[in-house]
Amino acid sequence: MIDWTSWMDYGFMKMALAAILIITPLFGLMGTMIVNKKMAYFSDALGHSALTGIAVGVVCGIPDTNISMVIFAVVFALLLNKIGSRSTVSTDTIISVFSSCSVAIGLAILSKGGNFSKYSSLLVGDVLSITKKEIGYLVIIFIVTILFWITCFNWLNAICIHRALAKSKRIPVQLMDYVFAILVALIVMLSIKWVGILIINALLILPAASSRNLSVNMREYHVFSIIFSVFSGVMGLILSYYTNVATGPMIVIIASVIYFVTYFFGRKWKE
């Protein structure tokens, strides 16, 4: 018989659980606005830019790659927003160009001399290797994000509903775009090592998309998204322990199952 509590005997599992309980609510919360603002490509591009952030850290001799990833991601996010707001080319095209270029540069630098193998774990992530220092980073970004959400949510929501009307109400639309992009960049970069570059975007999008299938108002939209995100994270961690598979992909599998269930039964729920 399977002992469903044996995983709690290990310190690294407790550390992983702490990280998941801190960051998954942010995935659920920020994901709602990412879906509303149709920024799925943007968050995906940020995830892929992590390789370049690490490469910059290697070239500059920065010992903590988290710092180089965060700095590069913030610059990358601001640059995308700036060019996207001024260019006549579609936003998706601009993001694709920047993302492809960023990944290529990162791969070129990291693969020089055949050393890329030691960075391959970033593709699928490894939450079990998270450190107390990295959890500290997550706690800081959690507090900052919650404070931002409490103070600026109404502005963000107004911008999503009608951008021109928000400007007429003297809401700092451009500033909100920049701050939101920076927060997404920080959350993505500080989570990338344990979630994985290939699937980080799924954890931002799937809980919010699932919630949208069920919710009938904004409160439900946020609550369901956070619940789905936390549930996927915790169950993914536990099941990955017993099935001996990577935690990141398992979390995404569970989140995907939730999405399909809510997609097919969401209409009945709303009725």
What are the language-model segments listed below?
Residues 194, 200-249:
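Transmembrane alpha-helical segments in multi-pass inner-membrane proteins
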Residues 147-180:
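Membrane-helix/interface signature in polytopic inner-membrane proteins
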Residues 3-15, 71, 87, 91, ...:
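Transmembrane helix-bundle core of multi-pass membrane transporters
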Residues 32-115, 211-223, 240-242, 266-268:
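Short loop segments and helix-boundary regions at transmembrane helix junctions
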Residues 154-155, 264-271:
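Membrane-interface capping segments at transmembrane-helix boundaries
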Residues 16, 65-71, 92-96, 134, ...:
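Loop-to-transmembrane alpha-helix initiation sites
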Residues 49-59, 97-109, 129-130, 173-185, ...:
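Small-residue-rich segments of transmembrane alpha-helices in multi-pass membrane proteins
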Residues 3-8, 120, 124-128, 228-230, ...:
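C-terminal binding/interaction regions
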